[in-house]
């Protein structure tokens, strides 16, 4: 999860997030290169005396600053499109969970486990135990297995919400009357936190998401939900 004074992204817990981190570093390298070239050009302009105000045409220069940005855009667009298509792939998920956004809590349905349904509310400060996180912990966590593809069906009952867990590289809008879906495969057990990432009203900041990822063998032994 995120921590104070953190500079980079959160550690990846899914293949998609690993790809996003690589793409972030790739794009950042290009941005640094552009900044260096611009600052270098400004430095030369401000320090050299060999300037001319009579230049009215420079075909070579115009060709370069037209082709070079096009190449840079292609270098950014190709890996971005690859990741975009990866996020849309649905490869035979092991099971499906439905998430419904409300003002201001989440409802989860384990359709493959006897239709288990429960609500997940943020824990008020008075109910926090030692080690719990303020504004991030919930009364009922979403328990999921690692190393198994999971499909999330996401919708809303009232206004726009967004179901997001940064460490998994997930952010899917919850839209009333529409069912969106996303898949992920977690690679490490642990507790992972997210929040509603679409402004949805006065208590938008108070509808967190907590995923408890456990080994697949333990998950298959039976219900382990913290209800």
UniProtKB/Swiss-Prot annotation:
<keyword id="KW-0679">Respiratory chain</keyword>
<dbReference type="GO" id="GO:0005507">
    <property type="term" value="F:copper ion binding"/>
</dbReference>
<dbReference type="InterPro" id="IPR001505">
    <property type="entry name" value="Copper_CuA"/>
</dbReference>
<dbReference type="GO" id="GO:0042773">
    <property type="term" value="P:ATP synthesis coupled electron transport"/>
</dbReference>
<dbReference type="GO" id="GO:0045277">
    <property type="term" value="C:respiratory chain complex IV"/>
</dbReference>
<keyword id="KW-0186">Copper</keyword>
<feature type="binding site">
    <location>
        <position position="200"/>
    </location>
    <ligand>
        <name>Cu cation A1</name>
    </ligand>
</feature>
<feature type="binding site">
    <location>
        <position position="200"/>
    </location>
    <ligand>
        <name>Cu cation A2</name>
    </ligand>
</feature>
<keyword id="KW-1133">Transmembrane helix</keyword>
<feature type="binding site">
    <location>
        <position position="207"/>
    </location>
    <ligand>
        <name>Cu cation A1</name>
    </ligand>
</feature>
<feature type="binding site">
    <location>
        <position position="196"/>
    </location>
    <ligand>
        <name>Cu cation A1</name>
    </ligand>
</feature>
<comment type="subunit">
    <text>Component of the cytochrome c oxidase (complex IV, CIV), a multisubunit enzyme composed of 14 subunits. The complex is composed of a catalytic core of 3 subunits MT-CO1, MT-CO2 and MT-CO3, encoded in the mitochondrial DNA, and 11 supernumerary subunits COX4I, COX5A, COX5B, COX6A, COX6B, COX6C, COX7A, COX7B, COX7C, COX8 and NDUFA4, which are encoded in the nuclear genome.</text>
</comment>
<feature type="binding site">
    <location>
        <position position="198"/>
    </location>
    <ligand>
        <name>Mg(2+)</name>
    </ligand>
</feature>
<dbReference type="InterPro" id="IPR036257">
    <property type="entry name" value="Cyt_c_oxidase_su2_TM_sf"/>
</dbReference>
<feature type="transmembrane region" description="Helical; Name=I">
    <location>
        <begin position="15"/>
        <end position="45"/>
    </location>
</feature>
<feature type="binding site">
    <location>
        <position position="198"/>
    </location>
    <ligand>
        <name>Cu cation A2</name>
    </ligand>
</feature>
<keyword id="KW-0472">Membrane</keyword>
<keyword id="KW-0813">Transport</keyword>
<keyword id="KW-0249">Electron transport</keyword>
<keyword id="KW-0999">Mitochondrion inner membrane</keyword>
<dbReference type="InterPro" id="IPR002429">
    <property type="entry name" value="CcO_II-like_C"/>
</dbReference>
<feature type="binding site">
    <location>
        <position position="204"/>
    </location>
    <ligand>
        <name>Cu cation A2</name>
    </ligand>
</feature>
<keyword id="KW-0479">Metal-binding</keyword>
<dbReference type="InterPro" id="IPR011759">
    <property type="entry name" value="Cyt_c_oxidase_su2_TM_dom"/>
</dbReference>
<keyword id="KW-0496">Mitochondrion</keyword>
<feature type="transmembrane region" description="Helical; Name=II">
    <location>
        <begin position="60"/>
        <end position="87"/>
    </location>
</feature>
<keyword id="KW-0460">Magnesium</keyword>
<dbReference type="InterPro" id="IPR034210">
    <property type="entry name" value="CcO_II_C"/>
</dbReference>
<feature type="topological domain" description="Mitochondrial intermembrane">
    <location>
        <begin position="88"/>
        <end position="227"/>
    </location>
</feature>
<dbReference type="InterPro" id="IPR014222">
    <property type="entry name" value="Cyt_c_oxidase_su2"/>
</dbReference>
<dbReference type="GO" id="GO:0005743">
    <property type="term" value="C:mitochondrial inner membrane"/>
</dbReference>
<comment type="function">
    <text>Component of the cytochrome c oxidase, the last enzyme in the mitochondrial electron transport chain which drives oxidative phosphorylation. The respiratory chain contains 3 multisubunit complexes succinate dehydrogenase (complex II, CII), ubiquinol-cytochrome c oxidoreductase (cytochrome b-c1 complex, complex III, CIII) and cytochrome c oxidase (complex IV, CIV), that cooperate to transfer electrons derived from NADH and succinate to molecular oxygen, creating an electrochemical gradient over the inner membrane that drives transmembrane transport and the ATP synthase.</text>
</comment>
<dbReference type="InterPro" id="IPR008972">
    <property type="entry name" value="Cupredoxin"/>
</dbReference>
<keyword id="KW-1278">Translocase</keyword>
<protein>
    <recommendedName>
        <fullName>Cytochrome c oxidase subunit 2</fullName>
        <ecNumber>7.1.1.9</ecNumber>
    </recommendedName>
</protein>
<dbReference type="GO" id="GO:0004129">
    <property type="term" value="F:cytochrome-c oxidase activity"/>
</dbReference>
<keyword id="KW-0812">Transmembrane</keyword>
<dbReference type="InterPro" id="IPR045187">
    <property type="entry name" value="CcO_II"/>
</dbReference>
<feature type="topological domain" description="Mitochondrial matrix">
    <location>
        <begin position="46"/>
        <end position="59"/>
    </location>
</feature>
<feature type="binding site">
    <location>
        <position position="196"/>
    </location>
    <ligand>
        <name>Cu cation A2</name>
    </ligand>
</feature>
<feature type="binding site">
    <location>
        <position position="161"/>
    </location>
    <ligand>
        <name>Cu cation A1</name>
    </ligand>
</feature>
<dbReference type="Pfam" id="PF00116">
    <property type="entry name" value="COX2"/>
</dbReference>
């Amino acid at each position: 999860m995120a921590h104070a004074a953190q500079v980079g992204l959160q550690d990846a817990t899914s293949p998609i997030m690993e790809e996003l981190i690589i793409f972030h570093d790739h794009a950042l390298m290009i941005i640094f290169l552009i900044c260096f070239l611009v600052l270098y050009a400004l430095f030369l302009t401000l320090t050299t005396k060999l300037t001319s105000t009579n230049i009215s045409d420079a075909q070579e220069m115009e060709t370069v600053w037209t082709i070079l940005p096009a190449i840079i855009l292609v270098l950014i667009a190709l890996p971005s499109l690859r990741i975009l298509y990866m996020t849309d792939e649905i490869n035979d998920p092991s099971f499906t969970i439905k998430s419904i956004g409300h003002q201001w809590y989440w409802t989860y349905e384990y359709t493959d486990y006897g239709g288990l349904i429960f609500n997940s509310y943020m824990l008020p400060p008075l109910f926090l135990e030692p080690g719990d996180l303020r504004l991030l912990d919930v009364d009922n966590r979403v328990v999921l297995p690692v190393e198994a593809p999971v499909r999330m069906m996401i919708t809303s009952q009232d206004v726009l919400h967004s179901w997001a867990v940064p460490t998994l590289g997930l952010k899917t809008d919850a839209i009333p009357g529409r069912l969106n879906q996303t898949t992920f495969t977690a690679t490490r057990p642990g507790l992972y936190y997210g929040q509603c990432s679409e402004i949805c009203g006065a208590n938008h900041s108070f509808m967190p998401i907590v995923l408890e990822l456990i080994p697949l063998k333990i998950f298959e032994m039976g219900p382990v939900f913290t209800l």
